[in-house]
Amino acid sequence: MEYEIPRECLGEALAALPRIIAQLPFKVQFPVEVRFTGPDDVWLSHGYGRDSAYIAVHQFSGSPYEPYFRAFEAVCAPLSGRPHWGKLHYRDAESLRQAYPKFDDFRAVRDQLDPGRIFTNAYLDRVLGA
């Protein structure tokens, strides 16, 4: 799981991780990864319109992860966090609409270019709306 948050929120998000990890009934097996980017102008980009910090948390395949990932997401989402589109997250279209200023504009373009929803699947229905 990886989340992008506004760079100025990094300290708050990182400070929550030791508490989350201490409460887990299993060991965390990977280091936490942090990286930074500048803003961009791509509507559904994680870094749209702001300086960004990315925090990634991982577990080995087959190892328990859900309590860790859900607790981490619960920290990042209220910080205007945006989940990595290609990694596991639990958000849906309604919650993502709040995180992306151009979300509805993107959906309008999608409605115009793919009104029959030929280019969709269950994941896209969940994160963009049906």
Residue locations for each model-derived region?
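Activity-critical C-terminal alpha-helical subdomain
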Residues: 81-130
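Substrate-recognition/cap regions that form aromatic- and gly/pro-loop-enriched pockets
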Residues: 1-98
